[in-house]
């Protein structure tokens, strides 16, 4: 039965991918990838700053296992590489270009050359080192172009944010962003109840929770990402709750974001979930939060820092 369930999940993923045209990544989506891959792959030792300096400059160095897996993380996150197909997706390059060509000022000829070079790259086993070796020559040749296409410069990303006020801005939490989208300035008392974790079940609250779950990367079009929710419990020093978190989510009836939200709020995990959810709200306003060495202390500290949120740029 487990094998059948896994197979059905995989087939569902493929069907979702096949039925929807690929969408270009905006500046928020790209920034999330870069910072998350830093979080997951930067070493904790004395050479951490060296890696960060090199990666910030888009240099895939040093040539070691750490950089290899960082490169795979970014390629996967930017959807240049598809792990399900174990293939580089060269057909997505012109889609990314067309979406932002008036802002990036990239040249069609160079984009075509980049696409051809990526199409010729062989992912082989799909391991970190194989992907690194396959993509490195492409990267070195087209690094300036790829930085333009995937919003990898401060100036370029700023132009995208300015041109797209409809996406979450830097310094704005996903909770605040989704509140604006769902309520459009109306029914403020209802959203305040939502902020207090009251389950009103209103269409606006359901829309807001769906938006937040997607923004925090708890969900995407393929379904719930349980590991991401577990990670948030780990980040508030509650890793021992992982089995219970997984159990609550697995036994939850329904498949919408609000369904899972209700299950967590109504479970014995409620207070810990609130702490994890609030801490992620803070981090969602500043994707460099953890990279600056900041860690979870307590709920009061999170509330204090939330009051200080502004539009300070952290890139």
Curated annotation (Swiss-Prot):
GO biological process: sensory perception of smell; vasodilation
Entry GO MF terms: odorant binding; toxin activity
Family annotation (InterPro entries): PBP/GOBP, PBP_GOBP_sf
Source superkingdom: Eukaryota
Cysteines paired by S-S bonds: 37-73, 69-128, 178-211, 252-263
Keyword ATP-binding tagged: no
Distribution of this protein across tissues and organs: Distal-lateral and median lobes of female salivary gland (at protein level). Not detected in male salivary gland (at protein level). Expressed in female salivary gland. Not detected in female carcass without salivary glands. Expressed in male salivary gland and other tissues.
Residues reported in the UniProt entry to bind thromboxane A2: 55, 70, 170
Induction behaviour: (Microbial infection) Expression is not affected by Plasmodium berghei infection (at protein level).
Protein name: Long form salivary protein D7L1
Organism: Anopheles stephensi (Indo-Pakistan malaria mosquito)
